Each structure stands twice: as C-alpha cells, then as structure tokens.
A protein has these predicted regions:
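Active-site loop/short helix in cyclic nucleotide turnover domains
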Residues: 1-7, 23-24, 40-45
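Alpha-helical scaffold within the catalytic cores of cyclic-nucleotide enzymes
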Residues: 15-20, 51-80, 112
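A short pre-motif secondary-structure segment
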Residues: 28-31
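Catalytic-core segments of nucleotide cyclases and related cyclic-nucleotide turnover enzymes
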Residues: 49-56, 82-83, 97-123, 127
Length: 128
C-alpha cells in the first residue's frame, strides 16, 4: 500500500524546488497552506505596464515548470520500491502592489481572487 503522506510530502518538496528555480534570489517562495504557495517578486519595474510584463513572464515560467511531469520515488519498508509519475496544473493569481500601499491581508485577498478567476476560466492559467 502506498503511503499517501509520503507521496504528498515528496510532491510538495519537488514543487518548492521548481518554484525556487523560477525566481531570483531576491524573490520569496512560501507555502501558504495545503497546495497553495505565495511567490513575492521584489524590485520589479517602476511602470505598471513593465511590472505586469515581468510578472507575467515569471508566472508563465512557473506554470510551465509545475506542469512538467513529476517522477516521485516512494519507499516501502525503508527501500525505494516504486516510482510514480504525477502531473499537476497551476492556477496562478497575480496582483501588483507598491510597498506600503495595502495591508498584507488585502494583497493576499486580491491574489486569491485572481487565482479563483484563473480557475473559473479553465484552470492551468495565469490571471491578473
């Protein structure tokens, strides 16, 4: 029998690795809860148009990275017993803000609303 918690843990660890590979060192990747993550991009362009373009490039890079197949090794009795291929999609909500413009909670609410718009439009997409 497969250990589902081990599978979930392995998947989350691989997801974090992929997310971190898509952003710069100055950016932040954090697990928000369950299967939700927050990515904060720092020092984007000053103009709204350029910032949106930069964020869109990173969001699409993340979407594609997360869509690639995961091959997860699972153990039984302490030894690798099985490799499972798994595929995920990502619905990504993006919001732009200037430091100090809104509370942390307000920013997360806006990003969450954008994510649900992405899901409503068919999942596996980016929405601003």
């Amino acid at each position: 029998m497969l250990d589902r918690s081990q599978f979930a843990t392995n998947l989350l660890m691989c997801t974090v690795t992929r997310l971190k590979a898509c952003v710069r060192e100055i950016d932040t990747v954090a697990r928000f809860g369950g299967d939700e993550f927050v990515v904060l991009l720092d020092e984007l362009a000053l103009s709204l148009e350029d910032s949106m373009a930069q964020a869109a490039v990173v969001a699409e890079k993340i979407r594609l990275a997360l869509a690639a197949p995961y091959v997860l090794g699972l153990q039984r009795g302490g030894a690798d017993a099985l490799a499972v291929e798994h595929r995920c999609t990502a619905s990504i909500g993006v919001t732009l803000f200037v430091h100090g413009e809104a509370s942390q909670d307000d920013i997360l609410v806006r990003a969450d609303a954008a994510m649900y718009q992405a899901k409503e439009q068919g999942r596996n997409r980016v929405f601003f």
